[in-house]
């Protein structure tokens, strides 16, 4: 499935791949061959857990070809976003790359992660239309402590990878209060933790918004963000995540 995805995406992006590819694979540090998929070698692409799995189009949780749509948790607890695009599962080796970017300050990893996300979006079937990208924001205090927002850096990389204009709007969705870290909280605690945490400084009337985040676990952050974006007029909100964790994951 993933191999089939790469060919049309590579054709669509054309020679940009050869110019954008960093020197080494972001997952294993192996030197990339000329013309390789940007950022990640083929061996690591094929080895990423969940890269080839069928997923619920709405929430991104694993599904099977014969699965009853009603069996998915989002059939009874609908998320605020309309669809999910996920590169792979939150598992080795992808989890190490995500945490190295987020907590290890390895900003060079934002580019290959954004490129992977762009490839997964471009390979979506049916095609998903996006008008703009909005990164999930950090609170001012957390941004000051970390020094950067990893989701903004990934969104910029994603936008730079595609040929069609895809504006990144980093300052419209705002986190207006500090919240406890989501990791380690129960599902209910995650939901309550984020109520009233976001506001929107602009309008998105009629737009299809790509909401970028690194990891989705319960979906609470994306749900609350999507609620605020739709209140600001967004026609649809598509969750774009590098890694999809299970709901009981500590991520």
Predicted regions and their residues:
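Glycine-rich phosphate/pyrophosphate-handling loop used in enzymes and phosphotransfer proteins
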Residues: 1-251
């Amino acid at each position: 499935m993933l191999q089939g995805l790469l060919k049309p995406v590579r054709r669509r992006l054309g020679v940009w791949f050869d110019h954008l590819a960093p020197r080494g694979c972001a997952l294993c540090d192996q030197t990339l061959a000329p013309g390789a998929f940007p950022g990640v070698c083929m061996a690591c692409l094929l080895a990423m857990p969940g890269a080839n799995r069928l997923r619920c189009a709405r929430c991104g949780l694993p599904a099977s070809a014969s699965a009853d749509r009603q069996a998915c948790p989002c059939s009874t607890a609908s998320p605020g976003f309309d669809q999910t695009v996920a590169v792979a599962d939150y598992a080795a080796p992808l989890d190490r790359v995500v945490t190295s970017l987020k907590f290890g300050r390895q900003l060079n990893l934002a580019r290959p992660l954004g490129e992977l996300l762009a490839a997964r979006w471009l390979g979506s079937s049916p095609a998903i239309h996006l008008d703009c990208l909005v990164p999930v924001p950090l609170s001012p205090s957390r941004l000051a402590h970390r020094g950067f927002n990893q989701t903004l850096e990934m969104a910029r990389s994603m936008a730079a990878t595609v040929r069609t204009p895809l504006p990144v709007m980093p300052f419209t969705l705002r986190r207006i209060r500090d919240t406890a870290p989501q990791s380690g909280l129960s599902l209910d605690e995650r939901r309550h933790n984020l109520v009233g945490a976001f506001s929107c400084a602009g309008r998105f009337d009629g737009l299809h918004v790509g909401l970028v985040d690194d990891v989705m676990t319960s979906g609470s952050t994306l749900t609350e963000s999507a609620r605020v974006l739709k209140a600001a007029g967004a026609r649809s909100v598509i969750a774009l995540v590098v890694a999809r964790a299970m709901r009981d994951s500590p991520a």
